[in-house]
Amino acid sequence: MLLLGSMWVSTGSFPPMVVVESKSMMHEDDGSLGAIDPGDLIMVMSNDRADVVTFVEATEEGNENFGYESHGLPGDVIIYRKNGGTDTPVIHRALLEAVANGSGWDVPGTSLSNVQSVSWTLEYDCSYHGGTYKLRIEAWEPEHAGFLTSGDNNFGGCMVDQPSANSQGQGGGLVDFQGNPVQPVRDEWVVGVASSEIPWVGSIKLLTTGAAGSVTMKSWNYLALTILLVLASPIAFEYFPTLHTSPEEEE
């Protein structure tokens, strides 16, 4: 309880950590350190304490956030509720943000200012049909101010979570528990920003809830090794020699 309370104070979020269930943020098929894989525990920093840096801001030369990375790619990963609903939150990367400007839209991290629709090519690689191309947002008219988001696992072609921003050839996007298309993520729908990662440990919870199907064999192996090392460490310390200094030697 003391540890949980200290993490709550540190992050400003409760619960202060979430367990990742899906493969949507994986960078490699069998998982990798630094990326977000099924079974990882992710510390959630309150968005009141951390400003969200989008992918386009982190990849724009001259921007104050240029070069910033989180969990293996530029920009922050956010945890949000689809359309502000009560279904399981999504943990995906913030690609860009549409900010209202009079009758138009600004997109921080780009040259777009007071535009009626958003068209922009991101330096975001997508693998599709054996080739690689850049993610393109084409003539997107935001329903309201908010973030466009996407999972990092784009080996089957890039898909933006918000269907209204997906160009032809991309996936259909996400829907909420009522079947409504997910809209741009409002600030108040953001649960927090993904911070530190504890790999593999959350697999235990997924196993107990019957949701461990996405956890890779590599993660199970590393988890088993971690548990063995923790259990063996007290025994190992028993065999370490204890150094004594006699009073005569001290003189």
Identify the residue ranges that each predicted region occupies:
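Feature for secretory/organellar precursors and membrane-associated catalytic proteins
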Residues: 4-123
